[in-house]
Swiss-Prot record:
This is Quinolinate synthase. Its cofactor is [4Fe-4S] cluster. The gene is nadA. PANTHER family: QUINOLINATE SYNTHASE, CHLOROPLASTIC, QUINOLINATE SYNTHETASE A. Its EC number is 2.5.1.72. The lineage of its organism: Bacteria, Bacillati, Bacillota, Bacilli, Bacillales. It is found in: Cytoplasm. Catalyzes the condensation of iminoaspartate with dihydroxyacetone phosphate to form quinolinate. One of its GO terms (molecular function) is 4 iron, 4 sulfur cluster binding. One of its GO terms (biological process) is 'de novo' NAD biosynthetic process from L-aspartate. It catalyses: iminosuccinate + dihydroxyacetone phosphate = quinolinate + phosphate + 2 H2O + H(+). GO terms for cellular component: cytosol. Keywords: 4Fe-4S, Cytoplasm, Iron, Iron-sulfur, Metal-binding, Pyridine nucleotide biosynthesis, Transferase.
Length: 367
C-alpha cells in the first residue's frame, strides 16, 4: 500500500461532504453550534483556514487553546481545529468527562513526527554515556505526547515559542546541559539569545545516532535534536536579501522556528502571538514582510488593510497538514456528534498522559 492509499484510509468522511456548497455547510455548522450550546467547544489554531476559523470559539497557539479548552469544563466535546499533537495536549489537560475530537486524522505535524520516541530512547543512553547525569531534556509543545512523557519522567519540561527563553534559563538552574526537542532552530535561536555560542551547541542526528559538533565536546551546553518545521525552513537569507534590495523600507519579522541565519538578519523575531501583536500595534502605513505560515499572513493582510503586508517568501504555501482541517471535515465531525457517533477521538494512554502532564505542569508553574 502506497502513502496516498494509507492517507486515504485515514479519512473516513463520506464523499457527499466534498460536493456540498460552502453556504450549506456554513448554515449547518452554525445550527449545530447553536443546538449544542456550551456542550461544544471549538478551538482554532492561528494557522487554520478562514473557512474553519470563523467557527472557532477561541483562537490562539496550541498550548493556549488546550488550556482554554480545559477551562471550559461545561464542554463535553472539544472539536480541535489544529493538528494531532495539539489535540493530544488538549486531551491531557481536559477532564475525564470531556472528549477531544480531531476532524481529520491526517492533520499531523512533520516536525513533531521528526522526534520518534524509539529514536529518542535510543539517543538518551548514548548522550548519558558522553556527558553523564548532566542533561535535562526540554521539548517544544510541538511534539507528541510520548515525547512529552519522556521529558516529564526525567524532570524536564515543555516550552512554547513565547516562553522558550525563560524555560531554557530555568533548565540551566537544574542541570549543566539541555537536550532540546524536536526543533533545532527554536533551540538554537533561544540559546544564542541567552549568550550561548554556536560552538557550545551540538546536533543529535537520529538517523545516524551521532552527535554533530565543532570544537571541544566538553564545552557543549545545548544538544539540539535534528528536527525542523517544514514551513518555516522555507524562509531563507536570499528572501531577506531580496526584500532589502527591492523594498528597503520594509520591516522583516519572522518566527523563531526559522533558521538561525534568517532570525539574525530579520528586524524582529518572535512567537505567533508576538507577530500578531507587533503587526496590530504597528503604525498605519508601516510595511511588513512576515516569515510565518501563509494562512496567518493572509489573515493579517485582511485585518490590517492600512498596512502593507506580504509574505517574506512570495511562493510560500500554507502548512499542508494544518490545512487538512477544512469545513467539510468540521461539519462531518459535528454531524456525527449529533447522531451520537464520535469520530476521530484523540485519547492519550493514562501512563503517558500522567508523565506528559508533569512536563506541562513544570512549565505552567513558571508562567
Amino acid at each position: 500500500m502506497n502513502v496516498l492509499e494509507v492517507m486515504k484510509r485515514l479519512d473516513d468522511m463520506p464523499e457527499s461532504y466534498k460536493t456540498m456548497s460552502m453556504e450549506e455547510m456554513e448554515v449547518r455548522v452554525r445550527a449545530i453550534k447553536e443546538r449544542f450550546g456550551k456542550r461544544l467547544f471549538i478551538p482554532g489554531h492561528h494557522y487554520q483556514k478562514d473557512e474553519v476559523i470563523q467557527f472557532a470559539d477561541a483562537t490562539g497557539d496550541s498550548l493556549q487553546l488546550a488550556q482554554v479548552a480545559a477551562q471550559n469544563s461545561e464542554a463535553e466535546y472539544i472539536v480541535f481545529c489544529g493538528v494531532h499533537f495539539m489535540a493530544e495536549t488538549a486531551d491531557i489537560l481536559t477532564g475525564d468527562h470531556q472528549k477531544v475530537i480531531l476532524p481529520d486524522m491526517r492533520a499531523g505535524c512533520s516536525m513533531a513526527d521528526m522526534a520518534d520516541i524509539t529514536q529518542v530512547e535510543r539517543a538518551w543512553p548514548i548522550l548519558q554515556e558522553l556527558f553523564g547525569d548532566t542533561i535535562l531534556p526540554l521539548t517544544y509543545v510541538n511534539s507528541t505526547a510520548a515525547i512529552k512523557a519522556f521529558v516529564g519522567r526525567r524532570g524536564g519540561a515543555t516550552v512554547t515559542s513565547s516562553n522558550a527563553k525563560k524555560m531554557v534559563e530555568w533548565a540551566f538552574t537544574q542541570k549543566e546541559r539541555i537536550f532540546f526537542l524536536p526543533d533545532q532552530h527554536l533551540g538554537r535561536n533561544t540559546a544564542y539569545e541567552l549568550g550561548i555560542s554556536l560552538d557550545e551547541m551540538a546536533v543529535w542526528d537520529p538517523h545516524t545516532d551521532r552527535l554533530e559538533y565543532k570544537g571541544d565536546i566538553k564545552k557543549v551546553k545545548v544538544i539540539l535534536w535534528k528536527g525542523h518545521c517544514s514551513v518555516h525552513e522555507n524562509f531563507t537569507v536570499r528572501h531577506i536579501e531580496y526584500i532589502r534590495r527591492t523594498k528597503p523600507d520594509m520591516n522583516i519579522i519572522v518566527h523563531p522556528e526559522c533558521s538561525w541565519d534568517v532570525v539574525q538578519q530579520a528586524d524582529y523575531a518572535g512567537s505567533t502571538k508576538y507577530i500578531i501583536e507587533t503587526i496590530r500595534n504597528a503604525p498605519s502605513g508601516s510595511k511588513w514582510a512576515i516569515g510565518t505560515e501563509m494562512n496567518l499572513v493572509n489573515r493579517l493582510m485582511h485585518e490590517h488593510p492600512d498596512k502593507e503586508i506580504i509574505s517574506l517568501n512570495p511562493y510560500m504555501c500554507p502548512c499542508l497538514t494544518m490545512n487538512r482541517i477544512d469545513l467539510p471535515h468540521l461539519l462531518w465531525a459535528l454531524e456525527s456528534l449529533e447522531r451520537g457517533e464520535i469520530v476521530n477521538q484523540i485519547t492519550v494512554p493514562p501512563l503517558i498522559a500522567k508523565d506528559a502532564a508533569q512536563a506541562l505542569a513544570r512549565m505552567l508553574a513558571l508562567a
